[in-house]
Amino acid sequence: MRLVSLLPSATEILVKLGLEKNLIGVSHECDYPETVQSLPRLTSTRANPSLDSAGIHNSVLEVMKNAVSVYDLDVELLKSLKPDFIVTQDLCDVCAVSFSQVEEACRELLDCKIISLRPKRLGDIWDDVLSTAETLGVKPKGQQFQQEVDERVQAVRDRLADWGNERPKVLTIEWIDPIYIGGMWLPEMIDIAGGQVCLAESGQPAPIISREDLEKIEPDVVVVKPCGYKLDQTLKELDLLKTQIPWQDWGARLSTRFYLVDGNSYFNRPGPRILDSLEILAHCTHPDLFPEFGEQYASGMISLQSGLELP
């Protein structure tokens, strides 16, 4: 069985299901686990990823005015690989190559089938793993993953059950300029992690939030995890972040805690590491209750001191 993944989260799902040996091609953004980075790359971006967050945002908007997708698909390479299945998504044209591009390419690959993922909520992510496992003939692996999901989610819930009714207000930031806050599955994650959701609605795309609306929120916890940004990229935009959010107003009224998290690895990829992301969020929301997660994921997160300064 020959598999192509055009989405980082899909690649992680296939690896979790024990199918890494079947992978013959991936997208240009598939970087985990490291062993997939040597596989042929089937996509490239038309936007300029070297710009700051405002520049990337504007570059993507400009590309989408004039093109079907932000990404190019190497159709000739895809044909030469002769995959049996292509795993992609049809939810977000900014996240990966468009579904219509994949469909068009598959018309010339008569024996190739498309598995399309479309997660909006946590349950959709788990269902995508299960349905992919069943389609690819590894259903027990999918069931094994579902058991892991149930156990790890319940472990967080159980510890919170003995904690009382304290639920800090949690704001997650998905992009810095303009400010997007986490939507889709993030509100559910905040709820499970023992927090109150600020503004976002479960199952809905990440909304742009004005500074005026941010001033009204007064969050207890702010988790900054820009989509596709590793920690070093987010750190470069820390000064920009300070101009985008009313952090001084928040700090004057309450002791808001700020965290920077690797947004390339966590939260934004709807795959197996969403479980890791939930545990990170549990630590950020209740650090005294979940101290071990702070240690476990220390390489992927930074707790900022007051004044949004590095420790």
Where are these regions (language model features)?
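N-terminal ligand-binding lobe of clamshell/alpha-beta domains
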Residues: 1-311
